A protein has these predicted regions:
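An acidic/histidine-cluster motif and surrounding catalytic segment
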Residues: 1-107, 117-140
Length: 140
């Protein structure tokens, strides 16, 4: 079974880590993924630096996923599947914009980040629709 580690290095102490961990474990189990996962909750300023360094994009973003699997479609074999970084500031703003709760938006971002690690992309409208549908299966 995959292990999920969650760390909140943002200044927001109102994050319910247990519900995020449970969701992540459910997704990994459904995909029969054996690799472990790190989820790191960060501030916008931290995310801005990550985004610039690893994607060469300026500004912040809501979620970044980094796969540690050797091959794109390979299953991690008891090793680290990857890391998902989530901007808590972005999650709060998007929750207001989407008329969702903060917890719902964090769960959506966790699902979104993990789905990227599992091979989902959203380069086309069709891909985005497929990914959104899968996210909804988990966050309802």
């Amino acid at each position: 079974m995959s292990k999920v580690f969650i760390e909140n290095i943002s200044s927001d102490s109102k994050v319910k880590l247990s519900s995020l961990k449970k969701l992540a474990q459910e997704i990994l189990k459904d995909f029969e993924e054996k690799g472990d996962l790190n989820i790191i909750l960060v501030s916008d300023s931290f995310m801005r630096r990550l985004n610039q360094r690893f994607t060469s994009r300026k500004g912040t973003t809501d979620v970044l996923s980094f796969s540690f699997k050797e091959e794109k479609n390979a299953k991690a074999k008891g090793s680290l599947l990857g890391e998902v970084y989530i901007s808590v500031n972005r999650a709060r703003k998007q929750a207001r914009d989407y008329q969702a709760t903060f917890d719902q938006e964090l769960k959506r971002l966790v699902a979104h980040g993990i789905l990227h690690l599992l091979g989902y992309e959203h380069k086309t409208k069709k891909d985005l629709e497929k990914m959104r549908k899968k996210e909804e299966e988990y966050i309802g």
